[in-house]
Amino acid sequence: MGMKYVLPLRLIGLAYLLVLFQVHRVTGWELSYEQYHAAHLNEAINPDSGWNKSTKNLLLPFNRTRVPGSEGSREIQRFIIEHFNNTLAGEWAVETQAFEENGYRFNNLVMTLQNNASEYLVLAAHYDTKIAPTGMVGAIDSAASCAALLYTAQFLTHIACHERTKEYNDLESNTVVSNSTLGVKIVFFDGEEAIEEWGPEDSIYGARRLAAQWLADGTMTRIRLLFLLDLLGSGEEEPLVPSYYAETHQEYQLLNRIEDDLLFRRGDEINGESALAAEVARQRKHLDPTDYRFLGLGHSVIGDDHTPFLAAGVPVLHAIPLPFPSTWHTVDDDFRHLDAAETRHWALLVCEFVVQSLRSRNQ
């Protein structure tokens, strides 16, 4: 995340709440989303270097600098592309957008599920890191967000594969992915950070380039929502993520209801999933739908990858805390200061948000 926020905010008091995720009936047999997460989430999103040998870890590969055009950047690009092409069994269409600007080589990565959908929900984060300070790996900025999106893609692929079984084919009205007119795009932006000093020509390189392409080819008119994640996963007392735009406050309220389900649901539905339940029990609220401070402004208070899409009329849901965590743009933005539970919490929220968004189009 590049630009500083505009308005100083006070830290809101936080409560630590309880417990578990909702079980959904999606077919003739119960596919428990909570059970899927209990089986896969901890291994997929774990910053502990002891998990280095796990090929299923989606977070640790980001524990490196990812300056545009560098070998670290190329390695993480290969990792992301391989995740979609191989690990996810080719369910997603993979596009790259390579270009040069200001003396640097950039490459956006765009992944699409349901390539022929009439509209798209776009999930996005940037994968690059700042040039200075030297050695900054950008754990919250934005390795954690990228890992959450990779996990969301894995989760959606799991659902899509099951929907091709006979049980799902016999109960089409209960499908989530297959019959939705809403597709999903996951975008990994390059070049969000400034090369020298943040400004309109030295920032959000990838977002500006992709927005121009989507305006030219008509894709922009098919984007129902851009859901952008940034600066998530801090281990400190992270401030709340406010609702920034009146146009998407309804989507923000949906995300808030999902978080309430996650935090308030009691343990009688756990059925032995104690490890995940204990982790959820330590979580707190991140959203406050009664905070209307920004809804009447009619403009952004934060410069980020969403701005060219917002200017083009795309509704934006921006998940970024304000004020920013204290490790922002310092060498302390590393994996020692990254909170795995916070990162997993956001992965769960995004997964359920996408499922409910797709389901709403099937009704």
Curated annotation (Swiss-Prot):
One Gene Ontology term of the molecular function aspect: zinc ion binding
Gene Ontology CC, one term: endoplasmic reticulum
Pfam families tied to this protein: Peptidase_M28
Lineage top rank: taxon: Eukaryota
Keyword Mitochondrion: no
Keywords from the UniProt entry: Acyltransferase, Transferase
Additional note from the record: Present with 3970 molecules/cell in log phase SD medium.
PANTHER family, per database record: GLUTAMINYL-PEPTIDE CYCLOTRANSFERASE, GLUTAMINYL-PEPTIDE CYCLOTRANSFERASE-RELATED
The protein, known as: Uncharacterized protein YFR018C
